[in-house]
Amino acid sequence: SKLSGRTPVLKETTHWFLDLARYQDFLKKWVLEEHADDWKNNVLGQCRSWLEAGDGLQARSMTRDLDWGVPVPLPGADGKVLYVWLDAPIGYISATKQWALDNGKDWKDYWCNEERKLVHFIGKDNIVFHAIIFPILLKDHGGFILPDNVPAYEFLNLEGDKFSTSRNWAVWLHEYLERYPDKIDELKYTLTCIAPETKDAEFTWKEYQARVNNELADILGNFINRALVLTQKYYEGKVPACGELTAEDQQVLADMKAIPQRIAELVYQYKLRDAQAEAMLLARIGNKYLADNEPWKLVKTDPKRVETIMNIALQITANLGLVLDPFLPETAAKIRAFVGTEAKPWDEAGSILLQAGDETNAPTILFQKIDDEFVAKEVEYLHASQPAAATNFPPQKEETSFDDFTKMDIRLGTILDAIRVPKADKLLQLTVNTGIDTRTIVSGIAEHYAPEEVIGKTVAVLMNLAPRKIRGVESQGMILMAENEEGKLSFMIPEKGFEAGGEIR
């Protein structure tokens, strides 16, 4: 055991099983046929590996011998608890019932109403529990709706390593918001851009910097600021009238109208990364429209044409305040405040939201550029936070006196020979030159070193440990080893080429 260091003992026990094979035909039809076109490939692939590999589904134990968990309420089940993935999904229903009770709602309207859609947003390591085991429970009980979709995500890594809360290798949201309360949407945007919808992805602060600077600031922020500043400058903040439309104007307005529908389709396909990109496309279109038409130059020669250009730019601005709402709600609210509009139903997105003469307000900067110092600070903070994480190392032992310490005779020794101790997987019998004699030491390092690996190694030896027999071999001392959090052992080898017999003090 990595936790206790003790050797596991094989024992007989009794468990209760869920006979998954009984539901093989139901699941193959429901998952692989009925959802072949609308479920993600990674979900279908995992389900297929369970349903079609070998003899198909096999019975799976639904009980455990543990001292924590939900007790099994059956005769003869003393000491048994429910397998967590039998119990945990049922907790979804219990949580809904409690929420409904607290808020005067009917929980059955969510779990038993065929008009509702049950969607499991999960990580890829929990696909089978939400696409196979939980649906079996719902189906067998009866009266519950089955999941409409299980859009499982792949893994998100962080700065070249896996996220680990135990090692504190994480970006903690509450800490981020304490440091940057005005940068909520910047983090949301970056995370959605790199969402691991189809493959593993990685969050880095350099990526965050690039997304904020190159996309949010240079495209979205630049367009919004330019459209509103020019409106303040030319029309005292009032929306100008729209005149005759060119082919380019008509295409831009057609794109503005089509984008919300595409966003909705992508959202309902659970392609949130593409949906956000589609919303940002409207900002790109607006940015390009102003850059191509250069109203700041054209105003000197054709002010009427500029009125139409600015009207269209403001319509795009107002629509960005609507289509960005699902992704960047803080930013969308600011944009609506700039143009003086309220939050509107989605079916109004893509339409003309502003009338000639409507008042707009002077803008503020939506996104501040992220500099290299910000990135370096966050990476340093991430690394610096690791020592504060919980470790598996034991606490410091009680203090001992210097006199007691000096009683230990610790010296360098060289391993001359090594063989495995019969019928002992962990033990090596070592022949060690200690500088003053050659002695036999039995050491529990066989799971970490092969006999041929240790010959010639200079190691630390506790010399005056009382001899004792281990598996019939008298051991005359102890090899001192270093151990890491994972329980792996390593020799403590001197930095310089010291000879056997040198004292360690």
Identify the role of each PLM range.
Residues 148-152, 336-338, 429:
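Beta-strand segments within the central parallel beta-sheet cores of soluble alpha/beta enzyme folds
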Residues 250:
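Gly/Thr-rich phosphate-binding loop signature of adenosyl cofactor/nucleotide-binding cores
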Residues 2-233, 277-279:
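Structured secondary-structure scaffolds
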Residues 387-505:
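Phosphate-backbone binding interfaces of nucleic-acid-interacting proteins
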Residues 132-137, 315, 319, 458:
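Short amphipathic alpha-helical face segments that pack within enzyme cores
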Residues 332-406:
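Intrinsic disorder at enzyme termini
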Residues 1, 70-74, 111, 163, ...:
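Short clusters of hydrophobic/aromatic residues that line enzyme substrate/ligand-binding pockets
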Residues 195, 206-245, 255-359, 462:
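Helix-rich, typically C-terminal accessory recognition domains appended to large enzymatic cores
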